């Protein structure tokens, strides 16, 4: 799931307004109900961890733009949450949040965006949204992740290699690269 949203300053305010409205429209509920758009977290421990992460982020200077707490109902539900103003010295900057928490970062240019994107211990996937596809390709090449999607968030298919870099793993699953993970190759040399 997308967690860190790095926005150019020219679109940040407009994006945040539309994003916030979309989060307000999320329907929390039973994942078996087709009208539900956000189900529960996997466990009470996951809910407690996420609650502590958000509280700690705010305590360390992040702004709670929306949400930020467990939903008062049976189950392990957490409100769709948006955090802004996270600085590098905030623990949230380097943590992974496993739940509906979006971190918003604002940058002045592509170089800042790439530097911020790469300043992470993780690198499973990323996405670049742009009307300029050549610019997006340059950025995708510079982003340190195992997968980058342009104008799309994520996808999977048997023919697409899946995997990350840094603390998000080594090697690939799926595709011919995934099959090679299960092959032991042997070198045999005959000296003449």
Which positions does each model-derived feature cover?
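Conserved C-terminal structural/oligomerization subdomain of aldehyde/semialdehyde dehydrogenase
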Residues: 27, 70, 77-192
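Aldehyde/semialdehyde dehydrogenase
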Residues: 1-80, 111-146
